[in-house]
């Protein structure tokens, strides 16, 4: 899920070790698209990569409607990694921030009927799940 606005993180950026670029990203991007690590890949890349290592190839990524830059990145990643990415768009119902995880899942299930009759794994975009943990959940 990648539609959250990272308000708690934006209010806690105060370390002198944080670069101005990272501060700018935290103020202009959702958490999952902030670049991390030596590769400077968005955080969501590492989540997707661990899912691929756990044999997951189909993804439903929840975004806000104003996420064209992220959609472009994800379409390029989809081609590069030979995976399938479906976008769901979370309606904020006129609010500044989305309602939360359960609402995001509910809206996605309404946009993709096949999810109503199948098992799926939910990964928040601000947590890095190990390949081992993903495999355990998938095989449960």
Language model: regions and residue ranges:
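Conserved N-terminal catalytic core of the sugar/cofactor nucleotidyltransferase
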Residues: 6-27, 35-119
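Active-site neighborhood of HAD-like aspartate-dependent phosphohydrolases
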Residues: 30
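A short, conserved beta-strand element in the Rossmann-like catalytic core
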Residues: 127-129
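Conserved donor-nucleotide/metal-binding helix-loop-beta segment in metal-dependent transferases, i.e.
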Residues: 131-140
């Amino acid at each position: 899920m990648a539609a959250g606005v990272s308000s708690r993180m934006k209010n806690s950026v105060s370390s002198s070790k944080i670069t101005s670029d990272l501060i700018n990203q935290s103020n202009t991007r959702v958490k999952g698209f902030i670049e991390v690590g030596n590769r400077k890949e968005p955080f969501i890349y590492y989540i997707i990569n661990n899912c691929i290592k756990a044999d997951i190839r189909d993804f439903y990524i929840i975004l806000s409607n104003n996420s064209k830059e992220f959609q472009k990145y994800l379409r390029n990643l989809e081609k590069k990694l030979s995976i399938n990415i479906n976008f769901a768009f979370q309606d904020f119902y006129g609010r500044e921030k989305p309602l939360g995880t359960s609402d995001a899942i509910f809206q996605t299930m309404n946009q993709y009927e096949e999810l109503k009759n199948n098992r799926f794994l939910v990964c928040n975009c601000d947590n890095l799940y190990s390949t081992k943990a993903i495999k355990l959940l998938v095989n449960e």
